Amino acid sequence: EDAGLTARVDAYGTVAGVLPGKSEETLIIGSHYDSVPNGGRYDGCSGVIAGIRVAQALREEGVVPAYTLMILGLNDEEGVALTEGFLSSRGVCGEIDEAALDRVRHRTTGESLRQLTGTEQAEHIALPKECRGYLEFHVEQGPVLDHEGRGLAVVEHIVGICHGFWCIYGEQNHAGTTPMELRKDPMPVFGQIAAALPDLAKRYPKAV
């Protein structure tokens, strides 16, 4: 509001500020505002502040943007404080139910989301019907920019989290009398898999 935006907060802690443009088509600038212990002072919040500053500068210069700007501050991206994660993201996408207000709790205090926010209804900030795009400024959480001597870069790929599970079954036997060629120990096999994974990843440039 201090930046001249029409602001609101929903039941899931999502904060949105809107600056009308020449078109109802909306460009979203945002990030998450929660962080983790030792996450650094710029984790997430820098992207929200950058969006606010862009909108504020446009107002100060008397410029009406071509598109409506929505500055979005997303809650619980880290999934640390509460028992469920991505509350804001799920809320704006319409993928969370009202029962979450009582189901989701603070991991330390045990308070429900309803108690934490003091809200009675599960109102959520929705994505605009006409969305031009989503822009997020974020500090790099790796060494690449520093290594290459750059101060800024555009992200072309986002890492996807994929969990794989292997069950390696061995055969129990007497360790002092079973020759190595007759053993079926699972740990050496696991070691081979662990050793092969980095080489597999290195086949793809810039893989992490």
Outline where the language-model segments fall.
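Acidic/His- and Gly-rich active-site-bordering loop/insert found
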Residues: E1-G40, L58
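Residues at alpha-helix termini
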Residues: A3, E61, L116-T117
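Short coil/turn connectors at secondary-structure junctions
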Residues: A3-L5, K22-L27, V64-L69, K129-G133, ...
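General small-molecule cofactor/ligand-binding pocket signal
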Residues: R8, L72, A122
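Glycine- and acidic-rich phosphate- and metal-coordinating loops
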Residues: L27-H32, M70-L74, C167-Y169
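Alpha-helix N-cap/helix-initiation motif
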Residues: V36-G44, P179-P186
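A generic, well-ordered mixed alpha/beta core segment in the N-terminal half of proteins
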Residues: P37-R105
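Midchain, well-structured core segments that form catalytic/ion-binding scaffolds
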Residues: D76-E77, A81-V208
